């Protein structure tokens, strides 16, 4: 199977995208406190994530608290949780399928076509993972920016984009590249297999053979004794 380095690059990037997706899901720095106007309190930072909020004060340790009630969460936060959990599961499944489709792995024997289809499926799942990560990250960023410029929102309630959002965007880019590499490998492998088999030569019909034989016989001069 050709393009073996392409397989390695796609799976390595997919693994990095999976790690980035998991880190984005767990990190609390989705929304961080904004220091604007009269809210310049630099010795206290507030982080809000999908699962917990944290307060970090000067000369004090970081204190984090999980959200106590599921019913008290906003619909946007619940949807972001669900999408990120699905993204983590999809990335793990994509990585396992991609490993099974590797050249050196004998899960499918020596069937190159089956291995190519497995790698193509892995690439599609990595792209789907990127989409599932992109939706909550962009959604949350849109809410933060909208509230930041909304004069009706109190200054103390305004938030800025946290590091987890930037990590999520980077993970989406890596997942898209990984999926593109694996899908491209699958397409190239199918094209190579299709071009590798020569087209069968058309067989001459029997009627044409008989007609040619009759023509030759008629052209042969007849000798008379």
Curated annotation (Swiss-Prot):
Could you tell me which residue ranges are on the Extracellular side of the membrane? Answer: 29-81, 146-164
Quickly give the catalysed reaction: chloride(in) = chloride(out); hydrogencarbonate(in) = hydrogencarbonate(out); bromide(in) = bromide(out); iodide(out) = iodide(in)
Query: Its topology with respect to the membrane?
Result: Multi-pass membrane protein
Q: Name one GO molecular function term.
A: chloride channel activity
Where do transmembrane segments lie in this chain? 8-28, 82-102, 125-145, 165-185
> An example of a Gene Ontology BP annotation on this entry?
bicellular tight junction assembly
The function of this protein is: Channel-forming tight junction protein with selectivity for anions, including chloride and hydrogencarbonate, and for solutes smaller than 9 Angstrom in diameter. In the kidney proximal tubule, may be involved in quantitative reabsorption of filtered anions. Does not affect water permeability.
Specify the protein name. Claudin-17
């Amino acid at each position: 199977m050709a393009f073996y380095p392409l397989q390695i690059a796609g799976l390595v990037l997919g693994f990095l995208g999976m790690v980035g997706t998991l880190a984005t899901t767990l990190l609390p720095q989705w929304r961080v406190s904004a220091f604007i106007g009269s809210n310049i309190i630099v010795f206290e930072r507030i982080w809000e994530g999908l699962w917990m909020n944290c307060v970090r004060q000067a000369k004090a340790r970081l204190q984090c608290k999980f959200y106590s009630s599921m019913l008290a969460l906003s619909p946007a936060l619940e949807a972001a949780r669900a999408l990120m959990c699905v993204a983590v599961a999809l990335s793990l499944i994509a990585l396992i399928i991609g490993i099974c489709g590797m050249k050196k792995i004998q899960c499918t024997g020596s069937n190159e076509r089956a291995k190519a289809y497995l790698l193509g499926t892995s690439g599609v799942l990595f792209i789907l993972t990127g989409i599932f990560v992109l939706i909550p990250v962009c959604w949350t960023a849109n809410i933060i920016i909208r509230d930041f410029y909304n004069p009706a929102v109190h200054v103390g309630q305004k938030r800025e984009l946290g590091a987890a959002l930037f990590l999520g965007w980077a993970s989406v880019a890596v997942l898209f590249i990984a999926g593109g590499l694996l899908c491209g490998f699958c397409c190239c492998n199918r094209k190579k297999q299709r071009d590798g088999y020569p087209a069968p030569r058309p067989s001459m019909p029997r009627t044409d053979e008989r007609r040619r034989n009759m023509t030759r016989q008629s052209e042969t001069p007849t000798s008379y004794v």
